[in-house]
Regions:
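Intrinsically disordered, low-complexity acidic Ser/Thr-rich regulatory segments
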Residues: 64-80
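An amphipathic, hydrophobic-aromatic interaction surface with interspersed Lys/Arg
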Residues: 1-62, 76, 84-92, 99-198
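Long, intrinsically disordered, low-complexity Ser/Thr/Pro-rich regulatory/activation regions
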Residues: 201-223
């Protein structure tokens, strides 16, 4: 099973005898399995450490240390992180990933995690990779300054991108739904390659060069 890693696909294998291969694809359709547009953005924030980062900021800024009574809070944040990452991996795969990612099982008065073949850290890293290719996109294309909004979004509306893909690329709904954000960006750049304008980095470079020349002229005029 070959994964197209350039567009975000991942292939993982169960190395045990009789084990199978799994293909994970962070498509627009897979993103909708995660939840509502708001939940998709919340999931992205969670798997990139937003909850833990907030706890650390509070402790370091207000308390100046990490008190013992906060350990349960870190444990809950870690459990939420793992559970969310498991959700992302399963959303991106058509097969049941329980043998690989494990599962949460009720036991007496608590819920415990029964591990699969993959280490927890690998589950987290792969979930981050999938969300980056599924929501943000990692295509190496020029981002023009005029297209930058600088605004944070609270929603990721996958269906809007599916509709855009159908309109721009003449795809049917099923084909468009299987695109990842990275693939969508690459197709868009290929169809509209001659957009004029500057990226943020290009604009800043030109501005810095202009200001440097201006300063040199003024310094020379004062001599």
């Amino acid at each position: 099973m070959t994964a197209l890693t350039d567009i975000g696909e991942i292939s993982i294998s169960d190395s045990r005898e009789g084990g199978k291969d799994y293909l994970l694809r962070p498509s627009f359709e897979a993103m909708t399995r995660i939840g509502t547009p708001e939940e998709i953005v919340q999931t992205y924030a969670t798997i990139h450490g937003n909850d833990v980062a907030q706890l650390i900021e509070v402790c370091a800024g207000t308390l100046g240390r990490f008190p013992e009574w906060l350990s349960p809070s870190f444990n809950r944040a870690a459990e939420k992180l793992l559970s969310t990452c498991m959700l992302v991996l399963q959303a991106c795969c058509d097969d049941d990933l329980t043998p690989m990612i494990g599962e949460w099982k009720g036991w007496r008065h608590c819920v415990v995690y029964r591990p699969g073949q993959m280490p927890k850290n690998d589950i987290i890293v792969l979930a981050q990779h999938l969300m980056q290719h599924g929501v943000v996109g990692k295509a190496k294309v020029r981002q023009l300054q005029r297209h930058e909004t600088g605004e944070r979004t609270t929603e990721f509306k996958a269906f809007d991108y599916i509709s855009a893909a159908r309109s721009h690329f003449g795809m049917n709904r099923a084909e468009a739904a299987q695109l990842t954000m990275t693939e969508f960006q690459m197709l868009l750049a290929a169809k509209y390659p001659d957009q004029k304008g500057f990226t943020r980095e290009e604009y800043d470079s030109i501005a810095d060069e202009y200001l440097a020349k201006q300063a040199a002229r003024r310094a020379k005029a004062k001599q």
